[in-house]
Amino acid sequence: MWRRCLRLRDVGRRLLNLPRSGLTASEGLGPKLPTPIRAYVPPAERKRFYQNVSISQGEGGFEINLDHRKLRTPQGKLFTVPSEALAIAVATEWDSQQDTIKMYTMHLTTLCNTSLDNPTQRDKDQLIRAAVKFLDTDTVCYRVEEPETLVELQRNEWDPVISWAEKRYGVEIGSSTSITGPSIPARTREVLVSHLASYNMWALQGIEFVVTQLKSLVLTLGLTDLRLTVEQAVLLSRLEEEYQIQKWGNIEWAHDYELQELRARTAAGTLFVHLCSESTAVKHKLLQG
Amino acid sequence: MAALGSPLRTWRGLLRELRYLNAATGRPYRDTAAYRYLVKAFRAHRVTSEKLCRAQHELHFQAATYLCLLRSIREHVALHQEFHGKGELSGGVCWLSGSQVAPAAWRKGWEP
């Protein structure tokens, strides 16, 4: 069997005109080969060009300083955030970069840039509509009909979250095994639209981001209302995958990789929503007695 | 309310993650703005006579979310460097590149 696999590998190499020793990005091909095929090389990462990261308070909010330079967004605007905690978290992201700047790990910075630049040019109504639209195909509402163990798992894990959301907002959501998904009443949509309208633009960017990651508005509401932790929400979003992993085995470089990435993005989005919607007010308690 | 575990555990986890982040720079994590902010926030919400204080729960939730963020980024980067760091194609066509990473990754995936 192994000899057959090796033979197939050789056939594959010959079809792509690859040499026997394999090809790395740094090797060149000889001039006699017609079409050079190189492995994909991602664009060079930017080196860390600053020593110190600090925050300062300006007119529009908190700014990030990389040495003496003020951080700017991709569109050139001054990077300003409304909350000190968010500014500190963004500064920590920049300070934790080592030799090269790995933008794919800087989720809070990316969310702030999106809120400041608004590259998709969407207004508040459009963001709310985009988030509520996910309810039609919400992960926790879409049920399978077999195998029985997965059906039971979905019922046990997802039904309580849907019941909570229905009670919390006084709406009907339900679930469905139909390919078209659940039929969401108009009143449910109205109530959720008006609830989301109470958030500011920045928080809505975060909410829409989390909804897109988890493929579920119900789970996102669970996060914004402190009903679910990030780990719980991600597990519920990936319920079927986790079920298959339990059955067939885990592949670290695929499953764990995706799990950690989803956790990181969801955690960043959730934290972003909370930090953009809070207002710190010191209330002194009256001393009694 | 979400089951968060004990605030002390979250606090310890945050300190650990801040230590990892600052290990490369060699700077003590107690010098960072993040550490100072977290100390101030945890202290401010410690004194309360109410059993269920919403503000306290909110702070703990945010702290646990931040801990999840730091931990999952660290583990994601570690997985990226171990399995995807050489820039080769991922997934089923790894074997075409002839790189040493691909066969090991496939082997690891089939371990019981």
UniProtKB/Swiss-Prot annotation, chain A:
<dbReference type="GO" id="GO:0005829">
    <property type="term" value="C:cytosol"/>
</dbReference>
<dbReference type="GO" id="GO:0005743">
    <property type="term" value="C:mitochondrial inner membrane"/>
</dbReference>
<dbReference type="GO" id="GO:0005739">
    <property type="term" value="C:mitochondrion"/>
</dbReference>
<dbReference type="InterPro" id="IPR023335">
    <property type="entry name" value="ATP12_ortho_dom_sf"/>
</dbReference>
<comment type="similarity">
    <text>Belongs to the ATP12 family.</text>
</comment>
<dbReference type="InterPro" id="IPR011419">
    <property type="entry name" value="ATP12_ATP_synth-F1-assembly"/>
</dbReference>
<keyword id="KW-0472">Membrane</keyword>
<dbReference type="GO" id="GO:0033615">
    <property type="term" value="P:mitochondrial proton-transporting ATP synthase complex assembly"/>
</dbReference>
<keyword id="KW-0496">Mitochondrion</keyword>
<feature type="modified residue" description="N6-succinyllysine">
    <location>
        <position position="133"/>
    </location>
</feature>
<keyword id="KW-0999">Mitochondrion inner membrane</keyword>
<comment type="function">
    <text>Plays a role in the assembly of the F1 component of the mitochondrial ATP synthase (ATPase).</text>
</comment>
<feature type="transit peptide" description="Mitochondrion">
    <location>
        <begin position="1"/>
        <end position="40"/>
    </location>
</feature>
<dbReference type="GO" id="GO:0016607">
    <property type="term" value="C:nuclear speck"/>
</dbReference>
<keyword id="KW-0809">Transit peptide</keyword>
<dbReference type="InterPro" id="IPR042272">
    <property type="entry name" value="ATP12_ATP_synth-F1-assembly_N"/>
</dbReference>
<comment type="subunit">
    <text>Interacts with ATP5F1B; involved in the assembly of the F1 component of the mitochondrial ATP synthase (ATPase). Interacts with FMC1.</text>
</comment>
<protein>
    <recommendedName>
        <fullName>ATP synthase mitochondrial F1 complex assembly factor 2</fullName>
    </recommendedName>
</protein>
<dbReference type="Pfam" id="PF07542">
    <property type="entry name" value="ATP12"/>
</dbReference>
<keyword id="KW-0143">Chaperone</keyword>
